[in-house]
Amino acid sequence: METIFDYNQIKQIIPHRQPFLLIDKIVEYEEGKRCVGLKQVSGNEPFFQGHFPNYAVMPGVLITEALAQTGAVAMLNSEENKGKIALFAGIDKCRFKKQVVPGDTLMLEVEITKIKGPIGKGSAKATVDGQLACSCELTFAIQDA
């Protein structure tokens, strides 16, 4: 897969930083419409120290955060939104179907489905090797940083 935005370019679009930046690169992008990101899940992730020490599983809330960050890239790279911030405003119909563990490559897909003023919605899914790990509907609000 071709890299559209690498790790450093992502940091120019969204304000998240380590240890909370949860996407490594963007491989598909349609401004304001759709974005696909990848996260290489390493055993060295700080959250694995406590979740769980003897059974490492990526927390579901961090999978949904990674999806939200991917959606933020789709929205914040436009000229009208540069320098703004996308806030996580809600989540609906969230389901976890597969555990995400060290060594997995998490594919994060977000399609923006509705925008009304500064509020928007997106349909999101995270997969590992083509298997659904998480699906949800995200709500976000864009505001000045």
Curated annotation (Swiss-Prot):
The keyword Oxidoreductase does not apply. The active site is at 51. The keyword Lyase applies. It holds the Pfam family FabA. Keywords: Cytoplasm, Lipid A biosynthesis, Lipid biosynthesis, Lipid metabolism, Lyase. It catalyses: a (3R)-hydroxyacyl-[ACP] = a (2E)-enoyl-[ACP] + H2O. It is found in: Cytoplasm. Its EC number is 4.2.1.59. CDD domains: FabZ (cd01288). One of its GO terms (molecular function) is (3R)-hydroxyacyl-[acyl-carrier-protein] dehydratase activity. Signal peptide: none annotated. It is an enzyme of class 4 (lyase). One of its GO terms (biological process) is fatty acid biosynthetic process. GO terms for cellular component: cytoplasm; membrane. Its main location: cytoplasm. NCBIfam families: fabZ, PRK00006.1. Belongs to the thioester dehydratase family. FabZ subfamily. Involved in unsaturated fatty acids biosynthesis. Catalyzes the dehydration of short chain beta-hydroxyacyl-ACPs and long chain saturated and unsaturated beta-hydroxyacyl-ACPs. HAMAP family: FabZ. This is 3-hydroxyacyl-[acyl-carrier-protein] dehydratase FabZ. The gene is fabZ.
